[in-house]
A protein has these predicted regions:
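Terminal substrate-recognition subdomain of acyl/acetyltransferases
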Residues: 79, 137, 144-158
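Conserved GNAT acetyl-CoA-binding A-motif
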Residues: 102-115
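Helix-loop element at the rim of GNAT/NAT acetyltransferase active sites that forms part
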Residues: 15-31
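Conserved active-site tyrosine of GNAT-family acetyltransferases
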Residues: 126, 131, 154
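Conserved beta-strand-loop-alpha-helix junction that forms the acyl-donor binding cleft
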Residues: 86, 112-122, 140-145
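A short beta-loop-alpha structural element at the N-terminal edge
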Residues: 1-13
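Acetyl-CoA-dependent GNAT
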Residues: 7, 26-84, 95-96, 101, ...
Length: 158
């Protein structure tokens, strides 16, 4: 089940987010969220959805504008699924809910700025759901081990 986050979800949301940050292969952030910074980070999003399995938060997404003004109708999102629950199609449910929420919040396009080229599971999911790759940015992502990988921006009309 996907639903809007509540303050009681913050500890698990922060833990899941930090797990992806620590892996260093998908999110651009390098610093883990603390209880305080995590609360502020999630509160400032346009929308945050969480995935629950058996009453426990196992995944989440954040949704926010990708730009301002005349480009403010384009949004951006990030997804995180607990490593113990990957491969269960939770990411797909999060993306589909995100597209619905983007429309409800008045966005017209969902754009992913920095999908790492080697993140094949995410790329195949996005393409299966109708996202279009905009090109490739050579060496656009610095992996945790220090080497650079290409990133692939994607978009989907909402």
């Amino acid at each position: 089940m996907i639903r809007a986050y509540e303050s009681k979800d913050l500890p698990l949301m922060i833990a899941i987010w930090n797990e992806v940050v620590e892996e260093g292969i998908a999110f651009p952030q390098e610093e883990a969220l603390s209880e305080e910074t995590g609360k502020a980070f999630f509160e400032e999003q346009t929308y945050c959805g969480v995935a629950e399995v058996d009453g426990k938060v196992v995944g989440l997404y954040i949704l926010h504008p990708n730009n301002v003004g005349r480009c403010g109708h384009i949004c951006n999102a990030s997804y995180a699924v607990s490593s113990s629950c990957r491969g269960l199609h939770i990411g797909e449910k999060l993306v589909l809910d995100c597209l619905e929420q983007a429309a409800k919040h008045g966005f017209r396009v969902l754009q992913f700025n920095a999908v790492v080229e080697s993140n094949l599971h995410a790329r195949h999911l996005y393409e299966r759901l109708g996202f279009v790759q905009l090109g490739t940015i050579p060496g656009g992502f610095r992996m945790k081990d220090g080497h650079y990988e290409n990133i692939c921006p994607y978009y989907h009309e909402v």
